[in-house]
A protein has these predicted regions:
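Conserved residues in the N-terminal Rossmann fold of short-chain dehydrogenase/reductase
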Residues: 98
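Proteins that catalyze or organize thiol-disulfide redox chemistry
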Residues: 1-65, 70-95, 103-106, 110, ...
Length: 150
């Protein structure tokens, strides 16, 4: 797959569909069953929970950046708009997920989240990097590029 395409799983039949990035706004349909495909990862961060974490993060066809956050956390609020911007910039190449650690303690405990924000970088179903704290945007972009190229 080249960087001008992404893969979207069909919610009906689970078939994996290769979609050109420049056609994501055309409401693509599944090639197998014809069902409408969900919006591609990357338009905006997706909320994940204890129940959906493995499916959304570890089963993703794209690398995933997970923002472990809480609503009362100042640095978490500061990095939120940066992650929204990066979600648009890396659309179709990187999925950005947000895990509210207050509402999802099981997943937070599983990954040893003790400070927030904590960013988890997952690629090919494996945790490949972790960042504790809210890095500046340029440092975060460098880290994302390293993960994408690895």
């Amino acid at each position: 797959m080249n960087v001008s395409q992404t893969i979207i799983a069909c919610p009906q039949c689970r078939a994996r569909n290769r979609v050109a990035l420049n056609r994501l706004d055309e409401r693509p349909r599944c090639g197998k069953c014809g069902a409408a495909l969900p919006p591609a990862a990357g338009d905006r961060p997706v909320a994940v929970s204890d129940a959906t974490f493995d499916r959304e993060v570890f089963a993703s066809s794209l690398p995933v950046l997970v923002d472990c956050w809480a609503p009362w956390c100042g640095p978490c609020k500061a990095i939120g708009p940066v992650l929204d911007e990066l979600a648009r910039a890396y659309r179709g190449r990187l999925k950005i997920a947000k895990l509210n650690v207050d509402d999802n303690p099981r997943t937070a405990a599983t990954y040893g989240i003790r400070s927030i924000p904590t960013l988890l970088f997952v690629k090919n179903g494996q945790l490949v990097d972790t960042q504790v704290g809210a890095p500046p945007k340029n440092a975060l972009v460098q880290r994302i590029e390293q993960v994408l190229l690895s």
